[in-house]
Amino acid sequence: MTSKINEANTDIKEDFFRGLHNGIPICLGYVSVGFTFGMMCTENGLSFLVAVLISLTNLTSAGQFAGTALIISGGSLLEIGITTFVINLRYMLMSLSISQKVDVALSIPKRMLMSFGITDEIFGVSMQTKGNISFAYFMGLMILPILGWSGGTLIGATAVSLLPDMVRSALGIAIYGMFLAVIIPPARTERAAAWVIAIAAAISCILYYVPFFSGISSGWMIIICAVAASSIAAVLWPAADEEEANA
């Protein structure tokens, strides 16, 4: 009995440290983006404590940036809520996918804790795991990225005042680089993805430059562009059924 317990504890430790190791590259990538977020917050009047708290409780990259930008611009609660919901809706699908690879006996509190740490990168790495995803592995995988995201936010929020204006201006475009890194790879391989990007960009330009739509806030523009572009793509380029894809 004792040997079995020791073996189980060893497996848990091995899974945890394997996840910790796999989370290192994600952590390093998140530091730079978190730095940009922290800089954005303090330059727009939010304290570094608020910036770090947002990062610790969100961990949603694009949704976090969009939601915070709306807070800074004075957007309504409804506007902020719908915008972040639409942008973060993909996490529901990721959670459903991961739920198929965890032990059915895993408790709901542990499942909820795992769902908190799901990001695009963590999801991608975890889904490459052969067999089931253990709770210990996922905890190890999400710890360093959370620390990297929050730590980067803290550094950016506190150190930005020490940087020259030229450097601060250059770092300000880092978020756009992050978004380009997200959309360009799928656009190069999937025609539908490229069209979704083009349609969303066209709608955004119309809403921004046509005087008739000048009363629409940036938050509602994001919602309209996302819903309209994805709806058009769903009609014109519906996803093939699994049976058709495997045929």
Predicted regions and their residues:
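Helix-loop-helix junctions within the multi-pass membrane cores of secondary transporters/permeases
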Residues: 3-8, 81-172
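Membrane-interfacial helix-loop connectors
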Residues: 43-45, 49-50, 54-89
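Extracellular/periplasmic helix-loop-helix junctions in multi-pass membrane proteins
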Residues: 189-194, 206-223
